[in-house]
C-alpha cells in the first residue's frame, strides 16, 4: 500500500473516501450530515461508522464519519484503532484510495504516526496462501494534514507498522515451510536488506558452548536447531549500554513426550511469535537508528516426540552450569531461553528483554488484553512500561518474588523446569531469572496477546506482532 501526504484543504483532496474522526457530543456541520447528528444516528461513539455518499463540499466520492469516543480520552492508541477499523471497513467495500483527515486537534506527530500504523496494520490479511481472486486491499492511504513534522511522523509510522507486519507474516508461516533453518534464512535476508549483522549458530557451535538446555529440546526433531543472532551497531554509541533482545523461536510445539491435546495444536506454529517479534523489532531499529547497540538472540527449534526425544525426568546442563530436571517437556520455551539469556550476557549485553509465548497461566491471569511483565530491576521495568504505554501495547507488571523459587525445587538437579499448578506464569519467570542473573532484565509473557482467534474491527485474526513497537521505542528512547 502506498502512503502519501497531502497538505491541501479538505475540499480539494481527491480520493475514493475521506475518513473523518467524530467525537461524542460534537456535531460536524460539514458534509450535509446535520440531520444525522440531530437524530443521534451519528453519536461519535468509539468506532461507530457512518458512510456518506457524494457529500457536499468535497471531491471525494465518500465520507466515512468514524466515532472517536470522548475527546478527553482520545490518544494515539485510539487513533491507531480508528484508522485500522476505517481501513478494514472501507476495503471490504472495494475502496482503493482513501484519505484520513487530521484536523488541528490531531496536529501532534504521534497522531500521524498512529494513523499510518493503524492503516497498515488494518490492511494486513493472513491470506498469503489463498489462491482465489477474492483478496481485497487498499492501494493508497493519504495522510491529510499540515503539521510541520508530518513527513517524519509518517515515515516513522510506516517503519514500525511494516516491521510489525513482517513479524506477523513470519508467525503466519506454516511449520512445514518455516522450520528453524527457514526462520534463520528469513532473518538473514532481512539483515542483508537493512544493514544488520547476522550470525547463525548451528548445533555443533552450541554444543561447544555447552547449551545443553537448548539442545535437549531439539533432539526429538529431524529439523536442526539454530541460534539466530542479529546485531545493530550505531555509528556513534552513547554510553555503555547494550540492549539485548531474546525471543522464543519454537517453530512448532507438539509438547514433546508430554504431548499436547490434538484440539488446537495447529496454532502451535505461533510458538515462535516471541522470536518473530525480535526479528521485526530489529528491522525497525535498523531504520530508526537508535544511539545504543542492540542485539537480538532467537533460539529456534522444533519440540517433537520421537525415539530420541527428551523425556520427563531427564537432567540437562545449561550453558551457565546449572542442572535442570525436565519434569514436563511441554515447558520447553524456558529451556531454550535459558541458554540464550546466558549467551546474550556473555556477549556483552548490559540490559535484557525477552519475549515468549511461554505459559497458559498468564492467559488465565490477564486474559488476552495485557502482556504479563516480570522484571528483576525496577528501572528496567519502568523503561519498558513507558515504551509500551507510548506505543499502545498494554502490559501489566506481575510479581517476581524469590519465595516462588520453592516451587521449582528438584530432588535431583539444581532446579526443575516446572513448579506445579499454581502461579505458573510467575514460576516460569522465576526460572528464567536464574539465567538473567544480575543483569537488568524484563520478561514479557505474550501467550495471551500474540494471537487473535477472531477478527477485531481494526486487526485481522491471527498474529498481532506484539511487542515490536514497544521494543523499537525502548531502543529509540534509551537514555544512559
From Swiss-Prot:
Any idea which positions bind Mn(2+) 1?
Answer: 253, 330, 332
**Any note on cofactor binding?**
Binds 2 manganese ions per subunit.
Q: Where would you find this protein in the cell?
A: Cytoplasm
Q: What Gene Ontology cellular component terms go with this record?
A: cytoplasm
Single GO molecular-function term?
Answer: manganese ion binding
The UniProt entry, under Gene3D superfamilies, shows: Leucine Aminopeptidase, subunit E, domain 1, Zn peptidases
> Taxonomically, which superkingdom?
Bacteria
User: InterPro entries in the record, alphabetically?
Assistant: Leucine_aapep/pepB, Macro_dom-like, Peptidase_M17_C, Peptidase_M17_leu_NH2_pept, Peptidase_M17_N
Keywords per UniProt: Aminopeptidase, Cytoplasm, Hydrolase, Manganese, Metal-binding, Protease
**BP-aspect Gene Ontology terms:** proteolysis
SUPFAM superfamilies per UniProt? Macro domain-like, Zn-dependent exopeptidases
Query: Where is the catalytic site?
Result: 260, 334
Q: According to its UniProt record, which protein family does this protein belong to?
A: Belongs to the peptidase M17 family.
Please explain the role this protein plays, according to its UniProt record. Presumably involved in the processing and regular turnover of intracellular proteins. Catalyzes the removal of unsubstituted N-terminal amino acids from various peptides.
Q: What NCBIfam families does the entry give?
A: PRK00913.1-2, PRK00913.1-4, PRK00913.2-4, PRK00913.3-5
Q: What is this protein called?
A: Probable cytosol aminopeptidase
Name the encoding gene, please.
pepA
